[in-house]
Amino acid sequence: VREFESLPPHHPLKQNIDADFMKLLYRNQSQGQKVLNFMLLTAFLSLVLAYIIGVTNGHHEPWLPTISELDETTPEGTLWSAGLTAAGVMSIPVWIKLYQKWDGQLRSSNADRKWLWFNLLFVVMAQIATVSFIWTVNLPLNKYPIPHGVTAGLYFYLTLLLGTVAILVVRKIDNYPKDIIKIRLVLNLAGYVSMALLALTVPEGVKPLFMYKDLGADHLHSVHAMPSLFEWLMVFTAQIGYFYTLNHDMEGESIIE
């Protein structure tokens, strides 16, 4: 064992074992976890690759475009819109499965009937948020600034609220891991703080949801670098939360029975 631990990370034996472990890890995931993680990976790569391509091509300043500005110019705009649309569609069955699992767990826990309604509220909010998200990424910011701002705002608000509702619901499930609840709580609060800081750091006289329209098409990204930073933090906070908490909830679950 000591001899193995002393091997450098690039040693073929260690690399083979690491590769086998990753295959085993993926193989041992449930169908629900695979769909969830593929959805999250698709969304993450769509954002990061679109940013890298846009900056490399000189379409955007490195510090810092808003996420929606990545949709202005191809090829990153095509990748951004198509990838995030696909991620949104993939999330729909995940929300439904999550609702079904929590419903069964709440009933098994003899939870008050109102929490069944809160769970229903959760999935309805999640689906409305998803539809808003899909509309947002298919209504280019430079062509449809107002519809884009409205749907983006609805998506962000609902995402934070459904995170809060999820915390209230899972607290009523017997033996639900307290560490998962704590992660949900911390990341949900981080999302609210990021949204508040975004609103507080927008340039004077500019509405947060319609920043692009108020500033004009040729503005410098540096003007809204801080609001953009908090927007990116909101998105990645949500993705981290989904990864760490929903992987627990989707354990052993199938999307297609």
Q: Which residues make up each language-model segment?
A:
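Early transmembrane hairpin module of multi-pass membrane proteins
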Residues: K23, L36-D103, N110-V123, Q127-A152
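Short, positively charged low-complexity motifs
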Residues: E3-F4
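Transmembrane-helix exit/juxtamembrane "anchor" motif
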Residues: V55-T56, I96-Y99, L168-D174, F243-E257
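Alpha-helical transmembrane segments and their helix-start/interface "positive-inside/aromatic belt" motifs
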Residues: L24-A43, I181-A190
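Alpha-helical transmembrane segments in multipass membrane proteins, preferentially the mid-helix core
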Residues: L160-Y176, M195-E204
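C-terminal transmembrane-bundle signature of multipass membrane proteins
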Residues: M195-E257
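Non-cytosolic membrane-interface motifs at loop->transmembrane helix junctions
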Residues: K143-Y155, H221-L229
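Hydrophobic cores of alpha-helical transmembrane segments in multi-pass inner/ER membrane proteins
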Residues: W80-P93, Y157-L168, L233-T245
